[in-house]
Structure formats: C-alpha cells, structure tokens
Design a protein with these regions (language model features):
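NTP-dependent small-molecule kinase module
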Residues: 72-138
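Loop/turn-to-beta-strand initiation segments
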Residues: 9-13, 59-60
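Short coil-to-beta-strand
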Residues: 12-22
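A glycine- and Lys/Arg-enriched "phosphate-lid" helix/loop adjacent to the NTP-binding pocket
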Residues: 24-97
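Active-site loop/lid in soluble adenylation, ligation, and acyl-transfer enzymes
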Residues: 6-8, 26
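Short beta-strand segments at enzyme active-site cores
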Residues: 16, 61-65, 111-112
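Conserved nucleotide-binding/hydrolysis micro-motifs of P-loop NTPases
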Residues: 19-21, 66-71, 117-120
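Conserved small/polar residues in nucleotide/adenosyl-binding loops
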Residues: 1-5
C-alpha cells in the first residue's frame, strides 16, 4: 500500500519509516556529510514541503528510542551484510538527529518507548509490553 492510499483506508496502517525521517534526519545528515549537494538538498526539501500538503500525518508515531551501544548490538545480531560497515560516528549522527526531531515533533500523537532494556524480537513478554503501550494510545 502506498502512502497516498493509506489515507483512504479505515484499517490501521503500520509503516517502518515516515517521510519526516527522510527530510529531518537522513537528508540533512547526507548534506552535512557532503554526500548530498546543497542544491539537491534544497530541491528535496521543496519536494518534501509539497508532499506535506498531500499526506496526512500518522495517527500515532511510535519512536523506539535506543542508545548507540544497543543499536550496535542489534545490528550485529541481525547480521545483515549491508549494515556491517555502518560506523559508530554515522549512527551517532543519526541518533542525535532523531532525538532533536522527536523532541520537536508536533504533527500528532507520539509514543516514545526506550528499548534499551527490551528485546521485542526475541522476548514475547517485551513484545506484549510494547503492544499494550500501543493499544493504550490508539
């Protein structure tokens, strides 16, 4: 289902990532690292502004907050080849941008869950805990 179609359904739609993250975290990070030229970055932000008028914000944004050591541990456990070269510096920059963005998020309801002591992939009890937190917010 595409983002546009999610506005017309009565069912809950779960997305792994929002358009906000691209505009407020990944694009500025690439620009700051010199991997996205300023002109492209400005064009991207202009496109993002246009999209904001077309896409309804989520009814509930769930932010899974994590420390860098926990992120590194999860990445190693997953064992994905394309994630093996992610540097601590890159993760730290993204984490800082996520924290700044989420602190100022005002487009809808926000559920912030610190997952440093939760393993919802391997531990059913942790999974149920997170589900209950989400159900309370919906």
């Amino acid at each position: 289902m595409c983002i546009r179609d999610s506005d017309s359904t009565k069912e809950n739609v779960i997305q792994d990532r929002t358009i906000y993250e691209d505009a407020f975290i990944f694009a500025p990070n690439l620009n700051a690292m010199g991997l996205m030229p300023q002109r492209d970055y400005e064009n991207y932000l202009s496109l993002f502004d246009t999209m904001l008028n077309l896409v309804k914000p989520p009814d509930l944004l769930i932010y899974l907050q994590s420390s860098i050591p926990n992120l590194v541990n999860k990445i190693h456990k997953r064992g994905r080849d394309y994630e093996k070269t992610i540097s601590i510096e890159y993760l730290s920059r993204l984490n800082e941008r996520y924290e700044a963005w989420i602190t100022n998020y005002d487009s809808g309801k926000l559920l912030k869950i610190n997952v440093d002591d939760l393993d919802f992939v391997e531990n059913k009890s942790d999974y149920k805990t997170i589900l209950e937190l989400i159900k309370k917010e919906l």
